[in-house]
């Protein structure tokens, strides 16, 4: 199980939103590269980055901030937001991104996901963000009529590295992960699933390490890390201990 610290980018700054609402953004660091270095020094092994402006614009917007982070940390980085074509996928991977996350295009253009996964094995993930059970797109501004499971099943044999499943209703509110829905998704597909949205405390780490969550590949933590509700050292120690005992 991997715990991914999250850096969400808006106007070149590190922010957290509440329920994906750009009007409810809190700036936690004016320098995303500095925040990335802080997470690296705390012992995290994989960084999760989202270009929020890019998600709304449909193209990369905070590229400079992302590139500065890549120059400042050696750990792997997965990136989502505004990745809508094969050219953008290839460009980010060439710049040093370990894994790209395709969200809106996974709903609108599933062929793109399959082509990208074939061209770059193990380096393409799909982001499925659900509101009331239905997948939201365009930076969560629109809600589709399909479920996360419907979309995930389209990619069962496509070689997708992971599905990142976010419960929008919980995102940024520190209410705890929606493990019931996330585990149900993981149990229904063969693609590794990463939980996101609502990470609140060490209790979430313990729940992720429980037997019923054994199929989950990881989870993403944001606001809980920034406001001190989740101690990185304690969380990572629990994860290391679980790995050693496995």
Swiss-Prot record:
Pathway field: Amino-acid biosynthesis; L-histidine biosynthesis; L-histidine from 5-phospho-alpha-D-ribose 1-diphosphate: step 4/9
Subcellular location(s) of the protein: Cytoplasm
Main subcellular location: cytoplasm
Catalytic reactions of this protein: 1-(5-phospho-beta-D-ribosyl)-5-[(5-phospho-beta-D-ribosylamino)methylideneamino]imidazole-4-carboxamide = 5-[(5-phospho-1-deoxy-D-ribulos-1-ylimino)methylamino]-1-(5-phospho-beta-D-ribosyl)imidazole-4-carboxamide
SUPFAM superfamilies: Ribulose-phoshate binding barrel (SSF51366)
Keywords for this protein: Amino-acid biosynthesis, Cytoplasm, Histidine biosynthesis, Isomerase
Top-level taxonomic group: Bacteria
GO cellular component term, pick one: cytoplasm
Enzyme Commission numbers on file: 5.3.1.16
Catalytic class of the enzyme: isomerase
NCBIfam families: 1-(5-phosphoribosyl)-5-[(5-phosphoribosylamino)methylideneamino]imidazole-4-carboxamide isomerase (TIGR00007), PRK13585.1 (NF010112)
The protein's name in its UniProt record: 1-(5-phosphoribosyl)-5-[(5-phosphoribosylamino)methylideneamino] imidazole-4-carboxamide isomerase
Organism: Nitrobacter hamburgensis (strain DSM 10229 / NCIMB 13809 / X14)
Taxonomic lineage: Bacteria, Pseudomonadati, Pseudomonadota, Alphaproteobacteria, Hyphomicrobiales
């Amino acid at each position: 199980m991997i715990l991914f610290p999250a850096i969400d980018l808006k106007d070149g700054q590190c922010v957290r939103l509440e329920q994906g609402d750009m009007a409810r953004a809190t700036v936690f660091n004016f320098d995303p590269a500095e925040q990335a270095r802080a997470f690296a020094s705390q012992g995290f092994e994989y960084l999760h980055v989202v270009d929020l402006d890019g998600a709304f614009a449909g193209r990369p917007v905070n590229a400079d901030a992302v590139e500065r982070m890549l120059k400042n940390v050696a750990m792997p980085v997965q990136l989502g937001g505004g990745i809508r074509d094969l050219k953008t996928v290839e460009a980010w991977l060439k710049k040093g991104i370990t894994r790209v996350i395709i969200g809106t295009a996974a709903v609108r253009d599933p062929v793109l996901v399959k082509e990208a996964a074939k061209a770059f094995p193990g380096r393409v993930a799909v982001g499925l963000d659900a509101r009331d059970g239905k997948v939201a797109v365009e930076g969560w501004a629109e809600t589709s009529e399909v479920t996360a499971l419907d979309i995930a099943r389209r990619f069962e044999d496509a070689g997708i590295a992971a599905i990142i499943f976010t419960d929008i209703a919980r995102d940024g509110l520190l209410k705890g992960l929606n493990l019931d829905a996330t585990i149900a998704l993981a149990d229904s597909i063969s693609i590794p699933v990463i939980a996101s949205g609502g990470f609140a405390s060490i209790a979430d780490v313990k729940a992720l390490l429980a037997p019923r969550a054994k199929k989950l590949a990881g989870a993403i933590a944001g606001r809980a890390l920034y406001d001190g509700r989740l101690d990185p050292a304690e969380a990572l120690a629990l994860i290391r201990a679980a790995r050693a005992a496995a």
